Amino acid sequence: MEITFENVRDIIVETLSCDVEDIKLDTNLVEDLEADSLEIVELSMALQEKLGAGIEDEDLEKIHSVQDILDYIKGKQG
């Protein structure tokens, strides 16, 4: 599956049980969506499962926004 904002957004909505309208590129996972550390790990696992591109455990603390997720995954791919 291609790495797009829409694909990542849909995984976030499914994993964090939030509204699709709440997800923008600058949406902060913790501050805006109130995700805790366990939910961030679950999100990384869902990204790995559905997109084949998760976030390394040691890098999770660097991920704050949806844009961070996209940049990280695209950076790892190419």
What function would you assign to each model-found segment?
Residues M1-E21, G75-Q77:
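Thiotemplate assembly-line natural product biosynthesis machinery
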Residues T15-E34, L51-K62:
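Phosphopantetheine carrier-protein modules
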Residues E39:
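Two-component histidine kinase catalytic core, primarily the HATPase_c
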Residues E61, Q67-I73:
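C-terminal structural segments of small proteins and small subunits
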